[in-house]
Amino acid sequence: VKFRTALLAALPVLAACQGDAPTASTAAPSFDAAGAPFSYDVPVRDGYLTGAGGVQLYYKTLGRGPDTVVVVHGGPGMSMGYLDRDLAPLARGRTVIFYDQRGGGKSQLIADPAQLSLDHHLADLEAVRAHFGLDRMTLVGHSWGGLLAGFYAREHADRLEKLVLLNPAPPTASGWAEFEAIVAARAGSATNARIGEIVGLWFAGQANQALCEEFVTLRFSTYFADPANMANLRGGWCDVTDAVAAGLLPTHLTILGSLGAWDLTAQLSHVTVPTLVVHGTADAVPFAGSQAFAAAIPGAQLWVMENTGHFPWMESPVPFFTGLNTFLRRADQQ
């Protein structure tokens, strides 16, 4: 309850807080034409798999190449809807697996808060790996999904082949609090006031898909170098039913609350797989968090993208897909 109260207050009204400004001094992976975006017309398959405790998890696969990538979406509480169509270029020559985390999207909704714990999410990732017969898997985690991938790496480093943290949520609880403060400072008083009203409607049981879209649009506009680039989204922020949308924010807060005062910075030294951490200079997530992730994993590469925010494929698609594909191919050769 204390965590929920604190975070609800943080969403609309946290005071301004400035994180360390990232620079372009970190070398990016070299680009080549083979990594450029291509047609989004790729083979698609979807279905359900059984997660921890019998929970049904919705999945979608793109492509049919021998190399396999598992994508972990952000949130918590959101769905793959903002990623599966937008990251389709990764399916060039490989199979890309997306899944909706428990309690969101098309996966089974969860009534018992205890079933939304970190342990359940990690067990679900293990279920995804087992369902697709992967001895080891390449994880690509975005935002909260990057943090979840970090927790998975802590527990199951031997089951990883490669690790990509795309604009990951901070590896510490204090870093997340700083992130919330930066979002509030960027949003301004009028937007913060409306966000506060929406949060009130959510917990009054009046949330629906349209309200979810408004909330996410207001909040995520602070995540971009240029908010106009939000129009480049091919999928949907809240591409879910009203019932799922109504549970998004409570699910989000429950999952974050279950993490306690997390700190992964000293818990990843045993992770030895090729690792790439991506950070955009305009991201609201503090640069220090991406730096800490890269420093915590031996040999990890930190790629800082100029004039790009939290969703680099929407603001700098050609360098993003080129660089990411270059990393994945080179990692295969190591």
Segment roles from a protein language model:
Residues 51-109:
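Conserved HGGG/HGGXW glycine-rich cap/lid loop of the alpha/beta-hydrolase fold
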Residues 119-137:
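Conserved acidic catalytic loop of the alpha/beta-hydrolase fold
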Residues 135-178:
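Conserved hydrolase catalytic core segment
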Residues 164-201:
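Flexible "cap/lid" loop of the alpha/beta hydrolase fold
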Residues 186, 190-266, 273:
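Alpha/beta-hydrolase
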Residues 271, 277-279:
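Short beta-strand/loop motif that positions the catalytic acidic residue
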Residues 284-289:
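Conserved alpha/beta-hydrolase "acid-adjacent" motif
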Residues 300-334:
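Catalytic active-site module of serine/aspartate enzymes centered on a nucleophile-bearing elbow/loop
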